[in-house]
A protein has these predicted regions:
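Bacterial N-terminal signal peptides that target proteins for export
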Residues: 2-17
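Sec/Tat signal peptide C-region and signal peptidase I cleavage site
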Residues: 26-32
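Positively charged, proline/Ser/Thr-rich regional signature most characteristic
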Residues: 33-116, 125-130, 197-262
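Active-site neighborhoods of enzymes that stabilize oxyanions during catalysis
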Residues: 33-34, 38, 46, 89, ...
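Terminal peptide-recognition signature
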Residues: 44, 78, 142, 160, ...
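Thiolate-centered catalytic microenvironments shared by cysteine-dependent enzyme domains
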Residues: 99-200, 218, 227, 275-292, ...
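C-terminal soluble interaction/assembly domains
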Residues: 246-247, 252-256, 262-315
């Protein structure tokens, strides 16, 4: 063996080890980045066999579906959890559609077969902007509970079928896991915090309802009064959605819409935290805006206390039309 060979041979193993560490370090971020807020049907088809990928079908009466629609056909291996009935929103303190408690979240999520390491792909029906809100609210709830890897199937079940992907019928039985929830307070806003914002500022209140609700011409049945939280700006969740494709609009269009809103911290709300979940999802998850939260109690909780202020363009004529049966 030459002197040169003797000098370099012992370095071969450490050098390879160092190279391996570099490769692993570079690969780790790439793997983390692969979990995107929206995934395509092609991506889901490719990853259906992955042990950590969990397909969560949330179709409900909101989209004209539910358990019956799931039984007729769903993404292979999917587990159904009715957004409207399973407990994703609960009544607390007499106020409906609220975020479940931590123990309730642990039970709901764990019994489905989801834990902290699961990559959940939420599948809505894919038929309407309100239906997308079901997926966005479920996505937000999972994130709030501490599930780090969550995505929504772009276009939902309708897109999966339209792209001629395989479906299966019948019931799917979950395999429960132990799930320990860790509440992510950075994603949510409570009524007290919103009241401080209304009084003193510090964040933009974004009302995700249609303009007629914002103006006080309409209200949700569960809300006690008309109008909006004073100082809020209106950003109807439907403006982010393309009704022709039943998907969110392209990224550039979403960014253009979002650019019309004030910058800085923001809190989205609507009637029940459903439409507002779409605004939150677009701003926070797709556009990467920092410090965007969801006031899940929204107008139903806000108006449950008559002392909380409201702004409204409602007139006596609007009230008269309602009395006569011509208005809301």
């Amino acid at each position: 063996m030459t002197t040169t060979a003797r000098l370099f041979r012992p370095l071969a193993i450490p050098a390879l080890a160092a190279l391996a560490l570099i490769v692993l370090a570079l690969a780790a971020p790439a793997r983390a980045e692969s979990v995107t807020p929206l995934v395509s049907s092609a991506w889901l088809k490719q990853h259906l066999g992955d042990p950590d990928v969990f397909v969560l079908d949330v179709r409900s009466a909101i989209d004209g579906g539910g358990a019956e629609a799931f039984l007729k056909g769903h993404v292979p291996g999917a587990i159904h959890s009715d957004y409207d009935k399973a407990g994703w929103r609960v009544t607390r303190g007499g106020v409906p559609f609220m975020l479940p408690t931590l123990p309730e979240l642990e039970k709901l999520i764990g019994e489905l077969g989801i834990d902290e390491d699961t990559h959940v792909v939420v599948v809505p029906a894919g038929v309407h902007f309100t239906d997308f809100g079901s997926a966005a609210r479920t996505y937000w709830t999972l994130k709030v509970a501490g599930v780090a890897k969550v995505s929504i199937l772009d276009g939902g079940h309708a897109a999966w079928v339209a792209e001629k992907n395989q479906t299966e019928s019948g019931a799917s039985k979950p395999s429960p896991k132990i799930f320990s929830a860790t509440l992510n307070n950075a994603l949510l806003a409570e009524a007290g915090e919103v009241q401080k914002i209304e009084q003193s500022g510090g964040a933009t209140l974004i009302d995700a309802r249609p303009a007629s609700f914002f103006a006080g011409k309409q209200k949700a049945p569960a809300a006690k009064a008309y109008g909006h939280i004073p100082g809020a700006v209106n950003a109807d969740s439907a403006t982010f959605y393309d009704a022709q494709t039943n998907r969110l609009k392209p990224q550039a269009e979403l960014a253009a819409i979002a650019a019309t809103l004030p910058g800085g911290p923001a809190v989205a709300y609507c009637n029940t935290g459903h439409w507002a979940a779409t605004d939150w999802f677009v701003l926070s998850e797709l556009l990467g805006r920092k410090d965007v939260r969801l006031y899940y109690g929204s107008m139903v909780e806000w108006t449950s206390d008559a002392s909380r202020p409201l702004a409204s363009a409602r007139t006596k004529w609007d009230d008269l039309k309602k009395t006569l049966g011509f208005g809301s």
